[in-house]
Swiss-Prot record:
It comes from Syntrophotalea carbinolica (strain DSM 2380 / NBRC 103641 / GraBd1). This is 6,7-dimethyl-8-ribityllumazine synthase. The gene is ribH. 5-amino-6-(D-ribitylamino)uracil binds at F23, A57, F58, E59, A81, V82, I83, F114. It holds the Pfam family DMRL_synthase. GO terms for cellular component: cytosol; riboflavin synthase complex. PANTHER family: 6,7-DIMETHYL-8-RIBITYLLUMAZINE SYNTHASE (PTHR21058:SF0), 6,7-DIMETHYL-8-RIBITYLLUMAZINE SYNTHASE DMRL SYNTHASE LUMAZINE SYNTHASE (PTHR21058).
Length: 154
């Protein structure tokens, strides 16, 4: 039988950086609340969590890159909300943010979870920030916890 290796959901002793956009703060603040609650419930100490605020979602990857290079963190959690408007700007921002965050993770070898919600409406964003569709900040924090534990054993 094959060995199954997976990360545990224990945040104790790890340092986390949460990188969050200020734009659409009424949504992003809920994502941060979900991430913080999840990290603490899984054993992270308040002093082991930093929140790095950036102006918008487009700035998340470069802040994540700098945070990863600092070696201060065991994992990063990227949070933001991009809501479709009437121009193609949405498509460009979404594509670059997702590619940028993935690139930081691959280049640094550090777990970098993606909790940037991309929606067609404010209603959809609200649903994904703690109402009907759960909280994507919570999901991103769980991913970071699991991955940092997996990286510890592989």
């Amino acid at each position: 039988m094959a060995n199954i290796i997976e990360g545990k959901l224990n945040a104790e002793g790890f340092k986390f950086g949460i990188i969050v956009s200020r734009f659409n703060s009424f949504i992003c603040d809920r994502l941060v609340e979900g991430a913080l609650d999840t990290l603490v419930r899984h054993g992270a100490a308040d002093g082991d969590i930093d929140i790095l605020r950036v102006p918008g979602a487009f700035e998340i990857p470069v802040a994540a890159q700098k945070a990863a290079a600092s070696k201060r963190y065991d994992a990063l959690i990227c949070l933001g909300a991009v809501i479709r408007g009437s121009t193609p700007h949405f498509d460009y921002v979404c594509a670059e943010v997702s590619k940028g965050v993935a690139s930081v993770s691959l280049d640094s070898g550090m777990p970098v979870s993606f909790g940037v919600i991309t929606t067609d409406s404010i209603e959809q964003a609200i649903e994904r920030a703690g109402t009907k569709a759960g909280n994507k900040g919570t999901d991103a924090a769980i991913t970071a916890i699991e991955m940092v534990n997996l990286f510890k054993v592989i």
